[in-house]
């Protein structure tokens, strides 16, 4: 089957703009065609940059073993973070900003050094971290009914929608990122829990994978980049009016409320 990567990239952009999700791409691309899926993601990143959006980092997705098993994959994926996706702690986020939104609690990193090597080690990654922060990632899918396989989510910018950064910002020394417990509430009811070890065994393992992958592609992580390392527990569906608070033991907390269109304010 022949297909146009540009046309498929445009379909995803149109879905985001119109709020109308599209059919899965895997039947067109082939279920194992990761190269084409990343090419579509790259085309859309290039389009957005050309139209004034600013890249500020990357996210790692598919870090939880149960999610990998569900999609039949044995590796994470990555997506691109833009400045206009970022909200501050306790933000009021327009509910309609992300299609079919769900939320995850994660650990975010801010880097102080470039990571140009495809064999980046755990220690090199650790020493490149300036700040560790709690975060919420709002994932969404431009694919109808979240009917996604690996290539669907990769092409769709790893299902990234927006992210909320909490506090405090801390140096990594002394933090137990592996064993830290996470609890997230929706409207004061516990809806998700987990710990750092559920993210590829350690959140920094996810960051090491990302650093190696991007360096091998000639697009290495740079000083100043934000990295979302992946979910610490199950993702949860968002409904209009919901308030979420995530506490990550020893790391901090982050909160957001999802409001009707026109009410929210972005803190980019």
Swiss-Prot record:
Originating organism: Klebsiella pneumoniae subsp. pneumoniae (strain ATCC 700721 / MGH 78578)
Pathway listed: Aromatic compound metabolism; 3-phenylpropanoate degradation
CC per GO annotation: cytoplasm
GO biological process: 3-phenylpropionate catabolic process
EC number: 4.2.1.80
Function: Catalyzes the conversion of 2-hydroxypentadienoic acid (enolic form of 2-oxopent-4-enoate) to 4-hydroxy-2-ketopentanoic acid.
HAMAP family: MhpD (MF_01655)
Entry keyword annotation includes Coiled coil: no
Pfam families: FAA_hydrolase
Protein name in the entry: 2-keto-4-pentenoate hydratase
Required co-factors: a divalent metal cation
Gene Ontology molecular function, alphabetical: 2-oxopent-4-enoate hydratase activity; manganese ion binding
Key words of the record: Aromatic hydrocarbons catabolism, Lyase
Keyword Lyase: yes
């Amino acid at each position: 089957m022949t297909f146009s990567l540009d046309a498929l990239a445009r379909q995803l952009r149109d879905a985001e703009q119109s709020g109308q999700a599209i059919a899965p791409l895997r039947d067109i691309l082939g279920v194992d065609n990761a190269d084409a899926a990343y090419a579509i993601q790259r085309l859309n990143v290039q389009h957005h940059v050309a139209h004034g959006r600013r890249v500020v980092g990357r996210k790692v997705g598919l870090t939880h073993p149960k999610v990998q098993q569900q999609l039949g994959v044995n590796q994470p994926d990555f997506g691109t973070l833009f400045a206009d996706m970022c909200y501050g702690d306790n933000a009021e986020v327009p509910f309609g900003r992300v299609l079919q939104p769900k939320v995850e609690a994660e650990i975010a990193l801010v880097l102080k050094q470039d990571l140009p090597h495809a064999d980046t080690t755990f220690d090199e990654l650790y020493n490149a971290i300036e700040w560790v922060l709690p975060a919420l990632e709002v994932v969404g899918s431009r694919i109808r009914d979240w009917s996604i396989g690996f290539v669907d989510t990769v092409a769709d910018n790893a299902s990234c929608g927006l992210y909320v950064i909490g506090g405090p910002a801390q140096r990594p020394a002394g933090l137990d990122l592996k064993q830290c417990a996470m609890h997230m509430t929706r409207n004061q009811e516990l809806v998700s829990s987990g710990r750092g070890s559920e993210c590829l065994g350690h959140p920094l393992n996810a960051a090491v994978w990302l650093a190696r992958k991007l360096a091998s592609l000639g697009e290495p992580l740079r000083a100043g980049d934000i990295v979302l390392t992946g979910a610490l527990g199950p993702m949860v569906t968002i409904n209009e009016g919901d308030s979420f608070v995530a506490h990550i033991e020893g790391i901090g907390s982050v909160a957001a409320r999802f409001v009707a269109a026109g009410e929210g304010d972005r803190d980019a």
